[in-house]
Amino acid sequence: MADKLTRVAIVNSDKCKPKKCRQECKKSCPVVRSGKLCIEVTPESRIAFISEQLCIGCGICPKRCPFGAITIINLPTNLESMITHRYAANSFKLHRLPMPRPGSVLGLVGTNGIGKSTALKILSGKLKPNLGRYDNPPDWEEVIKYFRGSELQNYFTKILEDDLRAVVKPQYVDQIPKAVRTPDKTVKFLIESRKSMDNLDEVLDTLELRHIYDRDVTHLSGGELQRFAIGTVCVQKADVYMFDEPSSYLDVKQRLAAARIIRSLLRPDDYVIVVEHDLSVLDYLSDYVCVLYGQPAVYGVVTLPHSVREGINIFLDGHIPTENLRFREESLTFRMVEGTEDFVAEKSRAFKYPAMEKTLGNFKLRVDAGSFSDSEIIVMMGENGTGKTTFCRLLAGVLKPDGTTRVPEMRISMKPQTITPKFEGTVRQLFFKKIKAAFLSPQFQTDVVKPLKLDDFIDQEVKNLSGGELQRVAIVLALGIPADIYVIDEPSAYLDSEQRIVASRVIKRFIMHAKKTAFIVEHDFIMATYLADRVIVFDGKPGIDAHANKPESLLTGCNTFLKNLDVTFRRDPTNFRPRINKLNSQLDQEQKLSGNYFFLEEGPDKEKERS
């Protein structure tokens, strides 16, 4: 009987439509044919119900379902006794829980839809874990008894006695203005009304909130809202601080400032938990890491805590040595050379753009003349408000430079920074309307559409898509339009760590095959260095006076950029991902003295010599 219980049957409530099909799942099920009620569904029922006890895991119904609504998975038997929470019959379930430790930062890493936000809800006391018994949930005594002997026992006892005050920074900061109900909506009022610690000045200075202090929340940009949300959490006195994706919308400098202010909250008796997809920031922030693996929207499993380096490497490698389990087919690495070996591109055509200036209100951007060739990706690095998007629009011809300077006309396809879905209809209809030729080409399907896994939601309404799904649709739309230059503004926003690496591979391969040029704005440093052939560094005063340098090689460009930020990076010897050095550590001081803020390639032997 034990192995029978290890099936997970998931019915997707958005896709399952019993009124529109002939109940193929029920008719094809061998258990139903033998007279047992394994699948129960009538045209009147809202969704099909599959009994996991009776299911034999034959895998026929997922193939027969015309809407692709059923997923059947066989789980390792030892997991069955560790269910922490399940929402309903045939729905997502979470196994185990991350274990927060007082006085240290716990990082959670895993793909979207694998239970990180569910784990945060449980740990913040908003959701009571039902241990998989969704029909008769256990009371708190049983829950605490279940977790006895682990660090979670004391934690839940405190939650039960109302001893734990948890503050959460939400994932979607763009929804904050709608949630503010007070008549006074200024940043000053909202922060000061919640203030219960005396670190207000430090928070305002580190997060650069002074110049927006008197502004209305409804007038803030994405990055300003993010810093406001982090600041609001940091001035409150609490026992548990939770940050759900604190780095989206922020540039590299602000990400590190946010990381420093989050680490400053640590006291011997409080807990800090962070969910983050930018792996270099997660690495810098956390003291230890829990990896979540499984299948998105089906089940999620939390691993035991690992050290930061080991945890992130396990996630990238796709293999957990302690459980001897592989949860992803291929491992993800960051060799700079791997991209260039596959594609030896003939750089036949060169484009030039002139030196130009552009004034927008009080903001002035000066651009040095530069040139670029086809099959090349140029990444723009700089703080928010230094004119990267303005430069994209100058290239695209949307804005005209000051004076008589003219940019040569080129066909340009652009993916904007913010995506607002206005299209009425499904994703497939949108593609057929905008990029029919590309969408029907087999090369485009294998290079772009398949790796980004658009088939999962291709027949859903565009308006109902999540942030990450919209982002992938926007990338496909931008690449599908025939053009000389592709301008992609922040392709990593809303994507999880795995999708970011896939997206950067897709963009890189597409640009090489199509022999075109791409200009990319990207703040995730790992993704930016993976993509870039050359770099344009933007410096100056954000929002006032900025300067775009001419395109430089990746090494010199990153060194210039990091020198402005006063940050150094080293490389991990196993998978070559860039890692931030702790401020004033020995490596940090050595690299600053020698002027090497960033390494292109560093073998394991060099790393050993150093250590």
From Swiss-Prot:
Residues 77-318, 345-565 form the ABC transporter domain. PANTHER family: ATP-BINDING TRANSPORT PROTEIN-RELATED. Belongs to the ABC transporter superfamily. ABCE family. GO terms for biological process: rRNA processing. SMART domains: AAA. It comes from the Eukaryota. The keyword Oxidoreductase does not apply. InterPro entries: 4Fe4S_Fe-S-bd, AAA+_ATPase, ABC_transporter-like_ATP-bd, ABC_transporter-like_CS, P-loop_NTPase, RLI1, RLI_dom_1, RNaseL-inhib-like_metal-bd_dom. It is found in: Cytoplasm; Nucleus. GO terms for cellular component: cytoplasm; nucleus. Residues 7-31, 46-75 form the 4Fe-4S ferredoxin-type domain. One of its GO terms (molecular function) is 4 iron, 4 sulfur cluster binding. Component of the multifactor complex (MFC) involved in translation initiation. Required for the binding of MFC to the 40S ribosome. Required for the processing and nuclear export of the 60S and 40S ribosomal subunits. The keyword Isomerase does not apply. Component of the multifactor complex (MFC). The complex associates with pre-initiation complexes. This is Translation initiation factor RLI1. ATP binds at residues 110-117, 382-389. Signal peptide: none annotated.
